């Protein structure tokens, strides 16, 4: 299920284009049968062939074999949990760390509401969403890289 954007009928230019049949359905060719019938039979086997080819040509192990009798000195989470791990590691109060972790998705859920009144799709005309996206794109790698460093260098990434 997708979100369909309705044309802006209050704009006289859009109304004139729609009256001539030149509105939102003006460009391109139909998806059926041109795209949906001919592209997947080529793309799906090609993707499978590339995956199998890489597996056959490079069958090296991903890491060293697991040893259930030896515990590593420092247990690190998977890479996609690194920013969250860094939040928990640097905040001294664990309850505050858990609340900060819960604030991330809660903040992302709030972002669309102030932007809902804005009819523009251009990111430069949607300052709240663009700022939140830019800040998240900058902070997430910073926290992720910092999680792999020792705790005394983790916030500054060893630069200062």
Swiss-Prot record:
Transmembrane segments: 36-56, 95-115, 131-151
GO MF annotation, one: ubiquinol-cytochrome-c reductase activity
Compartments it resides in: Plastid, Chloroplast thylakoid membrane
Membrane topology: Multi-pass membrane protein
Pfam families: Cytochrom_B_C
Biological processes annotated in GO: mitochondrial electron transport, ubiquinol to cytochrome c; photosynthetic electron transport chain
Keyword Cell membrane (UniProt): no
Keyword annotations of the record: Chloroplast, Electron transport, Membrane, Photosynthesis, Plastid, Thylakoid, Transmembrane, Transmembrane helix, Transport
A GO term from the CC aspect: chloroplast thylakoid membrane
The family this protein is said to belong to: Belongs to the cytochrome b family. PetD subfamily.
Subunit text: The 4 large subunits of the cytochrome b6-f complex are cytochrome b6, subunit IV (17 kDa polypeptide, petD), cytochrome f and the Rieske protein, while the 4 small subunits are petG, petL, petM and petN. The complex functions as a dimer.
Annotated NCBIfam families: cytb6_f_IV (TIGR01156)
Main function: Component of the cytochrome b6-f complex, which mediates electron transfer between photosystem II (PSII) and photosystem I (PSI), cyclic electron flow around PSI, and state transitions.
PANTHER family (alphabetical): CYTOCHROME B, CYTOCHROME B_B6 C-TERMINAL REGION PROFILE DOMAIN-CONTAINING PROTEIN
The name this protein goes by in its record: Cytochrome b6-f complex subunit 4
Classification lineage: Eukaryota, Viridiplantae, Streptophyta, Embryophyta, Tracheophyta
Gene: petD
């Amino acid at each position: 299920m997708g979100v369909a954007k309705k044309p802006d009928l209050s704009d006289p230019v859009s109304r004139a284009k729609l009256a001539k049949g030149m509105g939102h359905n003006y460009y391109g060719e139909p998806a059926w049968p041109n795209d949906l019938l001919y592209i997947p039979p080529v793309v799906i086997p090609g993707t499978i062939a590339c995956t199998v080819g890489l597996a056959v040509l490079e069958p090296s192990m991903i890491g060293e074999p697991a040893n259930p009798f030896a515990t590593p000195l420092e247990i690190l989470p998977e890479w996609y949990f690194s920013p969250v791990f860094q939040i928990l590691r640097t905040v001294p109060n664990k309850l505050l760390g858990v609340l900060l972790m819960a604030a991330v998705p809660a903040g992302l859920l709030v972002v669309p509401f102030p932007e809902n009144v804005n009819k523009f799709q251009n990111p430069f005309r949607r300052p709240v969403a663009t700022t939140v996206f830019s800040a998240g794109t900058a902070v997430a790698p910073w926290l992720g890289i910092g999680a792999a460093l020792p705790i005394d260098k983790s916030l500054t990434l060893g630069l200062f």
